[in-house]
Amino acid sequence: MANNIPIGSAVRTQVIINRYFVKAKKNLGQNFLIDQNAILGIVEAADIHAGDQVIEIGPGIGSLTEQLLLAGAKVFAYEVDDSLPEILQNELPKKIGDAPLEDRFKLMLKDVLKANFKEDLAGFFDMSKPIKVVANLPYYITTPIIFALAESDLHFASLTLMMQKEVAERLEAKPGSKEYGPLTISVQTEMDVKVALEVNHNSFMPRPKVDSSVVVLTPLKNKPEIENRKHFVWVVKMCFSQRRKTLNNNLKTLIPDSEKREALIKKLGVDPRVRPENLTIEQFIEIARNIPAK
């Protein structure tokens, strides 16, 4: 198969699968993207330019990796499937422009949730410059990865992530919607959320049961003032612990004293019978400020 045919095309993906006896591993949430328009759409959404430093999570057989490299990015990829490095080494272009592949691409066999980013990236990336994350995320670890990236101390320019459509809807949710919850609030206090692209489930091999969305997360320039982020996230989760109950009922565990609880609800300017999904992010921040950190 001529290598001028993109890895992400259905034809070349099938050739690679046959050549290396690849089987998508359900336990790793593997679904290979075979829609070249979607792949190029991800690269465009990530606004990739020559010289950009990109962390890719789960490169698979290299469908997205190839296009990131061709767009001029320097790519550091995390992968947990030890059967894939051989494929990436053989199938990715040997040269990108005038540079050999090893100057522009580095693969680390490691779970990104166990990554020490600064240690891993040292010597390959210029750590004084911002980093972009681009990934087709396995559905089963989407939320932990988003939290891990949001809470890391790396200087991120943006995170462009393909994920289950349902998760994307939770990320961009507004107060009053059923999708609004702890994930929404945790992410929106750190990042601007934009859904850039919808990807049909037919764009994957094997075909998942659900559609996907490509979401671009950009760090907020003016983040809300949260004194203790770990405490804030815990308070939000506690407020949503019994979603159908009123705010007053959910706060009983956090503020046993009824007078103090009533005073806080009055300060928030809300009805005690309001449910947590109707509160704004600013109101959750105020609740956390009034509950002592443990």
Curated annotation (Swiss-Prot):
Its EC number is 2.1.1.182. S-adenosyl-L-methionine binds at residues 31, 33, 58, 79, 111, 136. It is an enzyme of class 2 (transferase). Keywords: Cytoplasm, Methyltransferase, RNA-binding, rRNA processing, S-adenosyl-L-methionine, Transferase. InterPro entries: KsgA/Erm (IPR001737), rRNA_Ade_diMease-like_C (IPR023165), rRNA_Ade_Mease_Trfase_CS (IPR020596), rRNA_Ade_methylase_Trfase_N (IPR020598), rRNA_adenine_dimethylase (IPR011530), SAM-dependent_MTases_sf (IPR029063). PANTHER family: DIMETHYLADENOSINE TRANSFERASE, DIMETHYLADENOSINE TRANSFERASE-RELATED. This is Ribosomal RNA small subunit methyltransferase A. It comes from Lactobacillus helveticus (strain DPC 4571). The lineage of its organism: Bacteria, Bacillati, Bacillota, Bacilli, Lactobacillales. The gene is rsmA.
